[in-house]
């Protein structure tokens, strides 16, 4: 497959409500759609998930799109791609920049699935017709507001809830939710807000029957997480410091965690994600699909991944209306008894809603890729 053209669509969707974590707050989803067009006129779509600020990882939206334009697309223009797995190797000499790589690589996967006239889910070996999903709730001002939100999402059908926590917004909030919802599948996500000095507080969370505590310590740390996991009965889950299967191997070798939050964007795309999922299954590590407030294209890629058999725990994927009044794809993803349907149409299985996308588009740039074919 040769790619003739790339289209970079910069859009920004307002969130229904601000989403707050221990490191910052988002009021909108600022992103790019990466559209690749091959010699047969097939369109593949990826979504660039890097945030505006370098507070989740080092990448930002502006740095990632620069890497895509100046480094990744020129590489794509220089060769025939025979299978989507080649993209990971093609980009491998470029250090880091996983989210930039993922946005382009996922567009290639979509294009190949469409060329083969099958869904992306089927192409990567997924078998589920629908997937269980959970919901992630950002930091709230008070316990009362949090309880109202949890009740709202439980009423909508979500069976697993993740609470963002931070110093002074942890034990009291978790305890209140657990008392009000004693049978709810519940977990806490710290986004690296704690350190070893907070051990007694983290140990106190053991009593609330949590599914896991996600990323309590630093984004580069494996050793302190291993120290903590040995002293907690609750699973530790790693997120930010997992960028490749090598990171999972390191975490497993020293006992840093018993669960992995797998995000396509954070690990560089589908090829890397599949390796991680397979490793986790072989080594009895719970793996589940995380989210980054994706719009419809990114959500579709996530659902395809989560439809594989390695994923038994509900992910942070959620329905389209969890974050947005309207999404950029049709059909939108709707919750049905705590589940989302896995698209069966070709590729990612949804199409761009051009009317909605145009409404929220900030700019569009086209780049020709057919000058350097070899």
Curated annotation (Swiss-Prot):
Q: What is its EC number?
A: 4.2.1.113, 5.1.1.-
Report the active site residues: 164 (proton donor), 263 (proton acceptor)
Segment forming the signal sequence = none
Q: Where does the sequence pass through the membrane?
A: none
The protein's required cofactors: a divalent metal cation
Instruction: Provide this UniProt record's keywords sorted from A to Z.
Output: Isomerase, Lyase, Magnesium, Menaquinone biosynthesis, Metal-binding
Chain sites annotated for binding Mg(2+): 189, 214, 239
What highest taxon heads this organism's lineage?
Bacteria
Asked whether the keyword Glycoprotein is assigned, the reply is no
Q: Which NCBIfam families match?
A: menC_lowGC_arch
Quaternary structure and interacting proteins, as annotated: Homodimer.
**Briefly, what is this protein's role?**
Converts 2-succinyl-6-hydroxy-2,4-cyclohexadiene-1-carboxylate (SHCHC) to 2-succinylbenzoate (OSB). Also acts as a N-succinylamino acid racemase (NSAR) that catalyzes the racemization of N-succinyl-L-phenylglycine. L.innocua has the menaquinone synthesis pathway, indicating that the species requires OSBS activity. However, the NSAR/OSBS is not encoded in the menaquinone operon, raising the possibility that both NSAR and OSBS are biological functions.
Q: Which family does it belong to?
A: Belongs to the mandelate racemase/muconate lactonizing enzyme family. MenC type 2 subfamily.
Under what name is this protein listed? o-succinylbenzoate synthase
Q: Which gene encodes it?
A: menC
């Amino acid at each position: 497959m040769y790619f003739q053209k790339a289209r970079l669509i910069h859009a920004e969707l307002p969130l229904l409500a601000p989403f707050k974590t221990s490191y910052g707050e988002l009021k909108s989803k600022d992103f790019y759609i990466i559209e690749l067009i091959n010699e047969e006129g097939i369109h593949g779509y990826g979504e660039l998930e890097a945030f505006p600020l370098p507070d989740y990882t080092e990448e930002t939206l502006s740095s990632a799109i620069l890497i895509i334009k100046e480094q990744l697309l020129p590489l794509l223009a220089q060769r025939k791609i025979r299978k989507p797995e080649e993209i990971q190797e093609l980009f491998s000499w470029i250090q880091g920049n996983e989210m930039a790589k993922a946005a382009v690589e996922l567009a290639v996967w979509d294009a190949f699935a469409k060329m083969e006239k099958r869904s992306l889910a089927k192409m990567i070996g997924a078998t589920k017709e629908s997937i269980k999903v959970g919901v992630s709730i950002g930091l709230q001002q008070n316990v009362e507001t949090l309880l109202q939100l949890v009740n709202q999402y439980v009423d909508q059908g979500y069976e697993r809830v993740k609470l963002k926590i931070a110093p002074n917004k942890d034990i009291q909030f978790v305890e209140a939710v657990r008392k009000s919802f004693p049978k709810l599948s519940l977990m806490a996500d710290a986004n690296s807000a704690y350190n070893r000095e907070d051990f007694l507080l983290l140990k106190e969370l053991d009593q609330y029957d949590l599914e896991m505590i996600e990323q309590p310590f630093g984004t580069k740390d494996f050793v302190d997480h291993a120290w903590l996991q040995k002293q907690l009965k609750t699973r530790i889950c790693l997120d930010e410091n997992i960028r490749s299967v090598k990171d999972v191997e390191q975490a497993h070798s020293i006992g840093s965690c018993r669960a992995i939050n797998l995000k396509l964007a954070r690990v560089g795309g589908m090829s890397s994600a599949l390796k991680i999922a397979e490793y986790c299954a072989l080594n009895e590590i719970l793996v589940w699909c995380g989210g980054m407030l994706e719009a419809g294209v990114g959500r579709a890629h996530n659902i395809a991944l989560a439809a594989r058999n390695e994923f038994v725990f509900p992910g942070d994927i959620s329905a389209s209306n969890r974050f947005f009044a309207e999404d950029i794809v049709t059909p939108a993803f709707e919750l049905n008894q705590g589940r989302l349907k896995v698209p069966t149409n070709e590729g990612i299985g949804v199409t761009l809603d051009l009317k909605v996308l145009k409404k929220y588009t900030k700019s569009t740039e086209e780049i020709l890729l057919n000058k350097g074919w070899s």
